[in-house]
Amino acid sequence: MTEEDNEATITESKKELSKGQQAKKEFLDKGNKLPLCVNEGCNNDVVVREWKYWSFKSECGRCINARKKGLKIPDVKIHKKDFCENNDGHLGFLCPVKTNLWKDFLESLDLDHLDGDHMNNTPDNVKTYCKLCHNRKSKDTGDWNSNKPSRRDID
């Protein structure tokens, strides 16, 4: 292989995008924008969980880090609760864990988009559920449907 052929191969390989890079490019080329952090008073973009599937978290990195460290950000109200909001049984079943027990298991609480659409990242569409209630709610409502419009996969 000549040096010229080698340079052409390197240039060609730089042009190839991974599936995640392709998905990000497609997302942005369609005019989409990342949702804003769900926390009141924060105007940062959310963290991308996985570009390949257009999967986004509900919060920005700054808010996630501050919340996990128990720090307050001036003029920002953290939306995520320190208990499962299904403690009243509004999902049609009661959360099996008592509200006062969550303080030692905060990593087992998720932010759930009620309509299943992660682009609709408004406080009235996002609730805190434990992993047990979140999984059951998602299964019952079809949020796990990989063909829903808010989910994307590039073949």
Task: Label the model's feature ranges.
Residues 2-28, 151-155:
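Short, intrinsically disordered terminal segments enriched in charged and Pro/Gly residues
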Residues 11, 33-65:
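BZIP DNA-binding basic region
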Residues 13-25, 41, 61-72, 109-116:
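Short Cys/His-rich Zn2+-coordinating modules
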Residues 35-46, 70-109, 130-132:
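Short cysteine-rich loop/turn motifs with clustered Cys
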Residues 48-58, 73-77, 110-127:
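Short linker/helix segments within small regulatory modules
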Residues 51-66, 96-103, 125-129, 133:
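Cysteine-rich micro-motifs
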Residues 65-68, 126-150:
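Short Cys/His-centered divalent metal-binding micro-motifs
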Residues 93-128, 146-150:
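Histidine-centered nuclease catalytic patch
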